[in-house]
Design a protein with these regions (language model features):
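Pre-NBD coupling/linker segments of ABC/ABC-like ATPases
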Residues: 223-236, 255
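Hydrophobic/aromatic residues in alpha-helical transmembrane segments
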Residues: 47-54, 95, 99, 114, ...
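Cytoplasmic coupling helices
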Residues: 97-116, 123, 179-223, 239, ...
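Membrane-integrated ABC transporters
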Residues: 1-44, 63-77, 95-99, 116, ...
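Cytosolic ends of transmembrane helices, especially the final helix of ABC transmembrane type-1 domains
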Residues: 233, 277, 298-323
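Physicochemical signature of membrane-embedded alpha-helices that form the seven-helix bundle of GPCRs
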Residues: 36, 80, 84-91, 153, ...
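Transmembrane helix-loop-helix hairpins at lipid-water interfaces of multipass membrane proteins
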Residues: 31-91, 168-198, 272-279, 283-296
Length: 323
């Protein structure tokens, strides 16, 4: 329990540090970014809702329907859907443009902080190699700090998006949404675990990767070309590369195969839960307590819940591992 609280505290410290950095870098850009994020959160739900209204309209067409009224309603919904989709694309483009500018502002802010810190240090520190190691480390990690800062903002956005989608499902049923979340978590955790395992494997075997590239560079280098031909060294170089590559390939294959088997089983759980929910939604339509539009609406909401939960856990892992 103590370790859990320590992890939560460490994660919250990262969030507060990142938010403080992004706000201090440019309050104006931060405000614009938050405003655009709000639109990014709301627009998918608006599209899902309008789509459900459109389906209800088309499903309710009958011989007794007033033709011109139906056409008018259809036109309004189609135009609304077009407007929302265009707005969604526009907001995403503006957000991407703003991220590029915001990135530059945060970068210069971090560099300025490094300079400010160095300016306040005693002169004798400049004679120490440890000082320059720290400065180089801070400079090299500045890009990573910026990446984490944007991931924190994304984490908050996906969390809010998930909460809205989850609350929408609760309006339909108080129990099944919890089962949906519980069924999705193992699959997401295993996917992240697989990525972490492959990444850790690659880090552990960087020496072997460098060995392969070094031998390849030797074989392609003019400097060694003559010796390779005179002493017939190509078979030796080739065998070294293939032996090293085969070892890496078999090891990586073993890791991915192990997690693939687990993922196959884990991916079944959310699909089964989703099918049960859709079946119950279908029954409500047949019994008359729901509409076809409701079926489409909640199907979209389920997708938002699953996608939001996946991105929350993914960004959490990226942020916490990069602390």
């Amino acid at each position: 329990m103590k370790k859990l609280f320590e992890k939560i505290k460490a994660f919250l410290d990262i969030i507060f540090f990142s938010l403080k950095l992004t706000v201090q870098a440019s309050p104006k850009y931060f405000s614009f970014y938050i405003l655009l994020s709000v639109f990014v959160i709301i627009l998918p739900f608006a599209v899902i809702y309008v789509s459900s209204l459109l389906i209800d309209l088309l499903a309710g067409v009958s011989e007794n329907s007033v033709r011109h009224e139906m056409i008018k309603s259809l036109a309004v919904l189609i135009v609304s859907l077009l407007f929302l989709n265009v707005m969604s694309k526009t907001v995403e483009s503006i957000k991407l443009y703003l991220e590029g500018l915001y990135n530059e502002v945060i970068t210069i802010k971090i560099k300025h902080q490094i300079m400010e810190k160095a300016a306040g240090i005693d002169l004798y520190c400049f004679d120490s190699h440890e000082f320059y190691d720290e400065i180089n480390d801070a400079s090299n990690n500045s890009t990573f700090i910026i990446q984490i800062s944007f991931q924190v903002l994304d984490f908050i956005r996906y969390f809010v998006q998930f909460c809205i989608a989850f609350a929408s499902l609760l309006f339909w049923n108080y129990i099944l949404p919890f089962f949906l979340v519980i069924s999705v978590i193992p699959s997401i955790l295993m996917k992240n675990k697989q990525l972490e395992s492959v990444y850790s494997f690659q880090r552990e075997h960087m020496k072997d990767e460098r060995k392969i590239y070094y031998i390849m560079n030797m074989a392609l280098s003019r400097e060694y070309a003559k010796d390779i031909r005179i002493y017939n060294l190509f078979p030796l170089l080739s065998s070294k590369i293939m032996n090293t590559w085969n070892h890496l390939y078999r090891s990586k294959k073993k890791i991915t195969k192990k997690y693939t088997k687990i993922l196959v089983a884990a991916d079944i759980l959310p699909e089964m839960t989703t099918i049960i929910i859709l079946f119950l939604l279908g029954l409500s339509v047949i019994e008359g307590s729901g509409t076809i539009g409701d079926f489409n609406y909640y199907q979209g909401i389920i997708g938002q819940v699953i996608a939001g939960l996946y991105m929350i856990i993914y960004n959490y892992g990226q942020i916490y591992d990069g602390k």
